[in-house]
Amino acid sequence: MSLCKNYAAGVMLAMLTASSITVKAQTKPVPQLGKNTIQEVIAAMTLQEKCMLVVGSGKAPRPAMKAGVSSGYVAPPPMIGKTERKVPGAAGNTTAIPRLGIPSLVLSDGPAGVRIDPHRKGDSTHTYFATAFPVGTLLASTWDPSVVEQVGRAFGNEVKEYGIDILLAPGVNIHRNPLNGRNFEYYSEDPLVAGKMAAALINGVQSNGVGTSIKHFDANNQETNRNSVNAIISQRALRELYLKNFRIAITEAQPWTVMSSYNKLNGTYTAERHDLITTVLRDEWKFKGFVMTDWGGGYSAVAEERAGNDLIMPGRPDQIEDLMSAVQHDSLSMKVLDENVAHILNIILKSPSFQKYAYSDKPDLKAHAIVSRKAATEGMILLKNEDHALPISKNIKSIAAFGNASYFTIAGGTGSGDVNKAYVISVAKGLANAGYTLDANLETSYTTFINDTTQKLRAIARAAHHWPGPVPEMIATDETINQKADNSDMALITIGRNAGEGSDRNLETNYTLTPSEQQQIKKIADSFHAKGKKVVIVLNIGGVIDMNGWKDNADGILLAWQPGEEAGNAIADILTGKVDPSGKLATTFPVKYEDVPSAKNFPGLPAGNPDHVIYQEGIYVGYRYYDTYKIKPMYEFGYGLSYTNFSINNLKLSSPVFNGLLTATVTVKNTGEVAGKEVVQVYISAPTKTIDKPAQELKAFGKTRLLQPGESQVLTFKINAADLASFHTDASSWITDSGNYVLKAGASSRDIRQTANFSVSKTIVVEKDHNVLKPEVAIDEYKGK
């Protein structure tokens, strides 16, 4: 249907929905939400009111780049209403119907902090900044759901105190490929880690009486042509990887809403797939909330409503007309529309807006900054530490900090994942706060260069009508480097990389360090090492990068990710030894990009403007691929060093024969000299007599409390039949095969410390699922070795 169809009438509808719907006074009282049953309220609604409720309003989606064009944008279609009335900068809202006691819900981005306008018209005395919490890759690297839940509780308080009902987070999509521009928002290459971390965040946020929207359902694993690309995936890969993460989070935390994704899945837009949204999500997983589109997602409003995609965001006037016409002409049943309305009303009943919560606009940002800083330290990963380069020696007093990101440290990614925060503590500032002397001339040089270059790039972008490009790294002269080696006690280099919504990362300039960057690292290392001084590199990045050609130049490497607004303070906490590093990788760093199993199938075909992407690697994503095909990674899944050492011993199983539930215990002991925490990862190798399987899969994990030197803790893990099951496509069932299994407990996927054998005597059919979501074409999938 043309966007211009009956547009004049659409404008009239839009005006009606700008704040509410009004109907002529009636002679008898009408039902009221909360006082009457939802069925009675729905029965009192007009068709127009129902259609307006399921078509929301708010910000237009971000302008989309024209395919194959380097500049210029496709203008977004006209949207209904504005969001400025209640919470300026919020992403959108639902339509209020005052005569029936139905308020408007306010929806806001984003995954690392509330994303609203920090300044408001007519209010010069108050600001509305939000806390920038660590990004998803860092939170997953804590391997500690309790830490993530604590972040969620603080996060949810800001959601509530700023007058928001539903947070459009978390994002839980799998790290299929390291070039995905939004991997920073997501958690892991492994569905167990991703699902558990998302559940923790949801539980924390929703403990405040506000809602979340888990996204992007499903298989939104790239930004290139995300609005139209067709993800072609086998049923098994969907069930075991790309749906399992959502299932874990939804069943363990019951988010109020689910957001469907932009892309097509096996030929159909996800927002229009009844088998995905109703059969799998509602019938199989028992989801009770409502489903909304991503902003401007999908194609047909009628098809979306038929599929069970309850709320269309942010709606257009013509969509309301389409829905009304569809009901009147029997192409959309009133029963389906009523069910979708009921799903939305059930959530409205729980909302702060319905309960008339008197939000303060004054959350405790100082307290939340403390939460953010602590969480950031828990998820930073020590990748390299030669000759005790870290923690920084007590005889170090002065530091030469190189790298743009030492002074303009990246708190988080861009797009809807960005946060309007009051400040970001830079790496240099954090070290200064810790008592170190930073080279003032270097700071002046970097600050001047970055400010001047930023202004130039913005001017160029405005003239060409495109987004500004990233500021290139300032390259210090040989003379400057040698001078700093003479005058400073150590060198610190911060490597910064950013990405975000709307585009994927560039292999040559974002994933890989540029030749000039690599050359500068070598020059700094050579100069400082010649003076007997250490060189430490901090990685201020949102996703995996190529470390070939330069990592050997560093004595120590700290993967700090994008740690939120307290970045520099948290980094200093780790570098100084105030906090022992305990983070572990939740995604693999390959030796080279070509080793990535999806490298030749990302972002799809035809090259340059893909309309489809084949998930040929099937279930062999991340460590499942590297371990099965015996490919050595740069840093394996689960890897992370500490300033102390731990032993993992005394693995015991409750029984050598599986009888429905297996309990495993291990003893972790701090055998080093400083207090620290260890993560124990439980992998299982399963028999492959019926179908191929990965060499091993993560089935459980746990993190110790802070153990003092010599202190021990017993960790307990429970494994059930569902944990052992694989999805058998022919039977459309989850089946635990009979045979011999090996349970492995270790500090990473390649650092296994203890093993134990057990057997399953009879094949167990754990669950029979619907035979849905079939790919339209045959896929020549990887089959393991």
What are these regions (language model features)?
Residues 1-30:
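Bacterial Sec-dependent N-terminal signal peptides
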Residues 25-726, 735-745, 749, 773-785:
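Glycoside hydrolase catalytic-domain context in secreted enzymes
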Residues 732:
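Extracellular/periplasmic metallocenter environments
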Residues 751-766:
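Short beta-strand elements
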Residues 762-777:
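Low-complexity, Pro/Ser/Thr- and charge-rich linker/hinge segments at domain boundaries
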